[in-house]
């Protein structure tokens, strides 16, 4: 370890000066002394604290900084002149401020100190009300007891008791007077601190108080003031609870007796009666009614009661109006009863009982009055016992049968005995009645509940079975949709897939309760009892009753059923028998309101009603098409207006189609195929010799929607498409040629005879009609779950009525077309003049344009079918009479054959949709196609176009039963027109009871350059009786629009006849298939060959029936004909 460092001392050289050493020592010593002098003052301060016992006034409290400061001040103050120096020192502001605060504190303590003031409190409270204006009407001193208590008396325990009972007095003792005098003597001394004004005021108070005491001693007699005081106190107490005058008088009597007892005990100084009476008069001025009761004797009270009786009602009301607010007298009933109600029997007799009351009621009233007398003096709660309530309820039930005046009189009579007013009695009786009526409902409600309990198990079991079946069907449907989805993915666009999802939702079975007579009867009984118990005002309207019934059914009756099985509106409807007499006003209004037909569309489009003018069907119809589509759908012609009848009837009122179809069947039983054959023969004979047949120039409107319809029909009705084998071209060749020659010859002659009908071409009157229909068609056709339905909308025209309904095949959607009057049945009446048809057509265009929002767009040429159909917009205006709409892309050429991007070189000139059963009188609707209708379009392969037949849906209830199916037979494989366009027409004659052929077109219309379409459309109306008288008109009609456009395409097409159920009772109808190769163009005798072919059914077509079949047999189908066949000529069930 190292040694610690040591400081080495250094010796100073030489010796130090001793004087220096002394001086330094002295300085150090002096400095030490000074330090010791001041240090104890700063560091060691001794403070002596004196503690004392704390009390409610003070407690020991010390502030250390202040104590140290005070001690230092004392130390400084030891020197003489320090204090003066401090105060005079201009820099000693702190000390000056402290002195100022101390002086101010002393001043406030002297002025506001509380020690002396506490002794003054009782004296300050002697007269708290001093200073109020006694003449102020707002201040009521009538009940100030200190004015009534004489100086010789004081309250039993001292002070005043407000609203706590009658005051009890005792003689004031001398000691109390001495105490008061002592207080008075002390009071001036205590007021020395107060200002002069306050002293004067207090002196005045004392003087007035002494004067009052003296005056009270001299004026008051105990008998007078005690009675008044008691009654007044009682009156004030009654404000909180309304007491009757009767009770008040009883209390008054008791107070009088108590007062007599006190008089005997105390024997106060008697006061002259004159002075007492004067006091009573003065006191009575403040309350006129109490002045009547202010007497001190029984005689005076009796006199007061007599005076009350003598008062008139007006005087009494006047007195009541002067009484203070809240007075119990204001609780009286009407003037006639006001005072008599509460007076005792000794003062007033009760109001008389009305005369003519039923004996049982009068007996009950007397029983109640007797019970009231027996229970006199009891409170209201104690009085109304169970027996009393029973009597009152019986009286209430009997008085309900009487008039309101008699009823009021009975209750007024009862109120004079009972401890309540008439109104209170009426309310109590009403409540008792309602409560009793509520008890009556328990038994019927229990019976209803039991009946429901008996009926529910069976219905719930049935519902469970339905749910199970629905679940199974849903699973099966999902499996089926999975299969269909693959095909849709190939065919439909994504957008269409999304649209279809919205419409495929299927609701499960509903919980619908099946009513029986027992439950319905019990429900009506419950409602009747409820209404009887309701105490609604007599003048209430039906709305109040309806609300009452609905609320009752919803709250009390509906819960009797299991949850979800019953609705309040159903209960209201089923129980109408029970409440109809009260709610009938509203019910009648509701019945009168027209019911709206709701059309459920998957695309949620609103209903569209198009009013079709009368002559619409008769005239030719141009096809305003905005978009040119590759394919031309001929199915549209037979689909859109299967039974378009233009009539000459005056203006039959629009009738419902469902109601009129059977009538049509009865009225037109004579239309038969034989008659049609005769007409055809006549037409053929007239047309003989006409060699030239020239079609009028086609209209400029490009046919756009027709092909779209075909594609849409195919792609939407392919739930389970099975390609049908195309018939060999050779088999169809010769009959078609034969038919075409006949039709052309006939058309030529018709054209010459009736050229003016060509003026109807270019009229797009069918467009408005079709405009709304494609939407239905598109939206409705999407239900793939339905078996192959022909989704083409149809217009069924009943013969007697002009109302046209479009029945949607799959979903029974219908759109009402109410044509004007001229639209009549031409099969029975004379034909309409050309001008009439022309006007009606124009009117149709206008009306449809208004109702449907007709907005044609510029013709956009979408070359291929895929192009036009991909534009999925639905343009209602662009659809012509064929109801064609821009269909979604459906690969008619799915195998790869694509249509060339060429617009239609020529459009359909007169695209009158001549449905097979067009019943347009003189001018059958024709749809004609020019030779080069679809130039440069490659036809799809044989199996493609025809794999999915496009059913032109026949109307569900169509007056004209014959259908014509137009099909284009297969042609050259490359779309050549060398072989000539082959058309197949199938005339579906009157449908039989079960199957009836529904015209179906499954042709994808593609036409090569120069290929001419065969024109073939002859409905039953075409061959009906009107043609006898309208040969000239028929010629023009045939040339322009009588002949339907058959897809003049050399594409393999299958003739499919779909059966439709018919309500007709005729025999089985045979389908007439008219086939034959069409010539290269329409310029060769097509009309003649067509009509002749129709008459002489070809070998492979079903022979025309010769049995008399009515022309207008409505097809009673749920919607339109549902086509779910898998091959050609396969009957389909609808």
Swiss-Prot record:
Residue spans of biased composition, Low complexity class: 792-804, 856-891, 906-932, 1093-1108
Tissue-specificity statement: Ubiquitous. Also expressed in numerous tumors and cancer cell lines.
Modified residues (Phosphothreonine): 166
Location of N6-acetyllysine modifications: 222
Modified residues (Phosphoserine): 173, 175, 323, 336, 338, 493, 660, 677, 1025
Annotated compartments: Nucleus, Nucleoplasm; Nucleus, PML body; Cell junction, Tight junction
Reported effect, residue 140 to L: Strongly diminishes interaction with HIRA
GO biological process: chromatin organization; nucleosome assembly
Region ranges (Sufficient for interaction with HIRA): 1-166
Keyword Nucleotide-binding carried by entry: no
Record's compositionally biased regions (Gly residues): 973-982
Main localization, broad class: nucleus
Domain of life where this protein originates: Eukaryota
Region named Disordered: 1-38, 78-98, 171-220, 253-282, 321-358, 480-504, 594-660, 712-836, 852-986, 1093-1134
Biased composition (Polar residues): 892-905, 941-950
Molecular function via GO: DNA binding
Coiled-coil regions listed: 479-542
InterPro entries in UniProt: HRD (IPR014840), UBN_middle_dom (IPR026947)
Family the entry assigns: Belongs to the ubinuclein family.
Cited function: Acts as a novel regulator of senescence. Involved in the formation of senescence-associated heterochromatin foci (SAHF), which represses expression of proliferation-promoting genes. Binds to proliferation-promoting genes. May be required for replication-independent chromatin assembly.
Protein name, per record: Ubinuclein-1
Taxon lineage: Eukaryota, Metazoa, Chordata, Craniata, Vertebrata
Gene: UBN1
